[in-house]
From Swiss-Prot:
<keyword id="KW-1278">Translocase</keyword>
<dbReference type="Pfam" id="PF14697">
    <property type="entry name" value="Fer4_21"/>
</dbReference>
<feature type="domain" description="4Fe-4S ferredoxin-type 2">
    <location>
        <begin position="135"/>
        <end position="164"/>
    </location>
</feature>
<feature type="region of interest" description="Hydrophobic">
    <location>
        <begin position="1"/>
        <end position="26"/>
    </location>
</feature>
<feature type="binding site">
    <location>
        <position position="144"/>
    </location>
    <ligand>
        <name>[4Fe-4S] cluster 3</name>
    </ligand>
</feature>
<feature type="binding site">
    <location>
        <position position="73"/>
    </location>
    <ligand>
        <name>[4Fe-4S] cluster 1</name>
    </ligand>
</feature>
<keyword id="KW-0479">Metal-binding</keyword>
<feature type="binding site">
    <location>
        <position position="147"/>
    </location>
    <ligand>
        <name>[4Fe-4S] cluster 3</name>
    </ligand>
</feature>
<feature type="binding site">
    <location>
        <position position="49"/>
    </location>
    <ligand>
        <name>[4Fe-4S] cluster 1</name>
    </ligand>
</feature>
<feature type="binding site">
    <location>
        <position position="124"/>
    </location>
    <ligand>
        <name>[4Fe-4S] cluster 3</name>
    </ligand>
</feature>
<keyword id="KW-1003">Cell membrane</keyword>
<dbReference type="InterPro" id="IPR016463">
    <property type="entry name" value="RnfB/RsxB_Proteobac"/>
</dbReference>
<comment type="similarity">
    <text>Belongs to the 4Fe4S bacterial-type ferredoxin family. RnfB subfamily.</text>
</comment>
<keyword id="KW-0997">Cell inner membrane</keyword>
<dbReference type="GO" id="GO:0009055">
    <property type="term" value="F:electron transfer activity"/>
</dbReference>
<dbReference type="InterPro" id="IPR050294">
    <property type="entry name" value="RnfB_subfamily"/>
</dbReference>
<feature type="domain" description="4Fe-4S">
    <location>
        <begin position="32"/>
        <end position="90"/>
    </location>
</feature>
């Protein structure tokens, strides 16, 4: 057998042995995540907007698990804060001042001024902006969370945040907050 083939076989066996060793070590020393962090993250809206003061929903969920206030998520609103309060076993708190007084807004791109640089698309955490390079962009308002992250990267300043009027189609129905009386057959008579 030539020396090249022997070297290839030895390197293959060595790679196989190290791969098996790494696989075993990964299972043996696996770090389990905190389930509270995972549950808190699942409750957050996943907009990664940073309005809470953290770079994304996962870091904010970690901070909540370590005792941070649960009322810093404007896109999640009161419903998310109440679910977080229930999860953490704390009393619900009013949303922070800037979150509560803030009117829901969505991004609006003045398409005639858009140069198609795609910087807003890259900044949008929920993929609510459509467009391609050197073509105008537009916002899918149903997907826009109003996080405001697309405004700053725009080099021609053609993105505005406009307030959304509440209509029957976009109004937040709090169905779990409406009192419902269950009437049994016996109490009808």
């Amino acid at each position: 057998m030539s020396q090249v083939i022997i070297a290839i076989i030895l390197l293959g066996l060595l790679a196989l042995a190290f791969g098996a060793l790494l696989g075993y070590a990964a299972e043996k020393f696996k770090v389990e995540g905190d389930p509270i962090i995972d549950q808190a993250e699942a409750l957050l809206p996943q907009t990664q907007c940073g309005q809470c003061g953290y770079p994304g929903c996962r870091p904010y969920a970690e901070a909540i698990a370590n005792g941070e206030k649960i009322n810093k998520c404007p896109p999640g609103g009161t419903a998310t804060m109440e679910k977080l309060a229930e999860l953490m076993g704390v009393d619900p708190e009013p949303l922070t001042a800037n979150a509560e007084t803030q009117v829901k807004k969505v991004a609006f791109i003045r398409e005639a001024e858009c140069i198609g640089c795609t910087k807003c698309i890259q900044a949008c955490p929920v993929d609510a902006i459509l467009g391609t390079g050197k073509q105008m962009h537009t916002v899918i308002t149903d997907y826009c969370t109003g996080c405001d992250l697309c405004v700053e990267p725009c080099p021609v300043d053609c993105i505005d945040m406009i307030p959304v009027a509440e209509t029957l189609q976009n109004w937040s129905w709090q169905l779990n907050a409406i009192p419902v009386v269950n009437i049994s057959e016996e109490s009808k008579c």
